[in-house]
Every structure is written in structure tokens, then in C-alpha cells.
């Protein structure tokens, strides 16, 4: 895990925003369905909640970067830790159809703050430069203040993007977090 941030949203829920990098060291096979555990603890070290999510396919030798958010319902965590992805023998697949992270590119074309809403709207597009269609693509927004990650969010584009194709997206993120720059990342997610 590169970074995490904990904030309260407009509903006074405790939202954990994480940014991850994951590498497939295997150069012959894609890896899929790696399980990553998250543990949230309070200031006394007591575990408030544990959860997990599954990594999607990572092409041979590739590194992916993405955001993940989780709402902690059992109190405000003061620390977050993650486990290394766990895999089984069935996690390793033929690499045919696997898209490398650098074969998807995303850009933000507009950031706006609609009147009456407590959200910023990030509009943009993602281009698939791979020779394979991207069946599902995760778009991650990483917000920074003075170069430090202060929040992140993501959405899943479930409409396939054909090879050489482009798709538009809009992501809404709470205005409760002050930022002065952002990154947008497209990650193959199938």
C-alpha cells in the first residue's frame, strides 16, 4: 500500500481511501484473483474491522496502480494495514488477452463543482492502446495536497473498450477534501 487517508464524509461515515501498487513477478503467466486483506485499527491498536478485496488480472511482469475505498462502520480508524496478495495455483493463467497497465491511458478533461452538490465532478476519457479489448477498466482518481496523497476514489467502467477504442467517464468525489493536484489512472480490471 502506497498511502492511505481516513476522512469523514457528509454522512459522518469514516472512509478509508487507499492507493496500491501490485506487481506480478511471474513473466510467463498472468495472475488473477489475488486476495488482499485490509485491517483497520483504533489508536489503542484494537482491530475495528477487517475486510478484503480481490485483485483482478495482472499481465506477466506488469505492475498496476489503483485506488480502493472502504467505509469503516465500527469507529474511526487511526491506522490501516494490508496483507500481501495471496494466490493459489488456479490464480496463474495463460496471458492471452491480458492488458498491461501502460496500454490504457486516462485523462481528465474537466473538473467542476456543480452548484448544490457536495461533490467535485471529474470528467474524462480512457483509451485502450492494447491489441485486446478491455472488458472492465478501473478508473482511479488520486487527490494530492502539496504533493501528498490526501484522498482517492475509483469507478469501474463495465462497458468493454475495444482495441484502439476510447470511452468517456465521470467520477464524483466529495468536496470535503481539499486538494491542489490529482492523478488519474486506468487499470485493466477483468
Label for each model-derived stretch:
Residues 22-28, 126-131:
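Asparagine-centered strand-capping/turn motif at beta-strand->loop junctions
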Residues 48-75, 151-177:
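Intrinsically disordered, low-complexity Pro/Gly/Ser/Thr-rich segments with frequent PxxP/GP/PP motifs
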Residues 99-138, 144:
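Short, solvent-exposed interaction modules
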Residues 71-112, 175-190:
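Terminal connector regions
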Residues 38-42, 141-145:
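Conserved aromatic beta-strand anchor motif in extracellular beta-sandwich/beta-rich domains
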Residues 13-20, 117-123:
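Short, solvent-exposed loop/turn segments enriched in Ser/Thr/Gly
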Residues 28-33, 47-48, 77, 131-136, ...:
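Short acidic/proline- and small/hydrophobic-mixed sequence motifs that coincide with surface turns
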Residues 32-36, 135-139, 180-182:
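Short beta-strand/loop motifs in extracellular/secreted proteins, especially
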Amino acid at each position: 500500500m502506497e498511502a492511505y487517508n481516513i476522512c469523514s464524509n457528509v454522512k459522518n461515515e469514516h472512509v478509508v481511501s487507499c492507493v496500491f501498487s501490485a506487481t506480478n513477478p511471474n513473466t510467463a503467466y498472468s495472475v488473477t484473483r489475488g486476495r488482499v486483506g485490509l485491517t483497520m485499527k483504533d489508536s489503542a491498536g484494537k482491530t475495528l474491522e477487517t475486510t478484503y478485496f480481490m485483485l483482478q488480472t495482472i499481465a506477466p511482469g506488469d505492475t498496476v496502480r489503483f485506488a480502493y475505498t472502504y467505509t469503516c462502520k465500527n469507529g474511526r480508524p487511526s491506522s490501516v494495514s494490508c496483507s500481501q496478495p495471496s494466490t493459489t495455483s488456479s490464480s496463474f493463467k495463460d496471458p492471452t488477452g491480458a492488458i498491461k497497465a501502460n496500454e490504457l491511458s486516462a485523462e481528465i478533461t474537466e473538473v467542476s463543482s456543480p452548484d448544490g452538490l457536495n461533490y467535485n465532478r471529474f470528467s474524462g476519457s480512457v483509451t485502450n492502446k492494447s491489441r485486446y479489448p478491455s472488458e472492465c477498466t478501473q478508473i482511479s482518481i488520486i487527490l494530492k495536497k502539496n504533493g501528498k496523497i490526501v484522498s482517492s476514489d475509483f469507478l469501474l467502467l463495465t462497458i468493454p473498450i475495444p482495441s484502439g477504442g476510447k470511452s468517456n467517464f465521470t467520477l464524483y468525489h466529495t468536496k470535503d477534501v481539499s486538494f491542489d493536484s490529482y492523478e488519474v489512472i486506468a487499470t485493466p480490471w477483468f
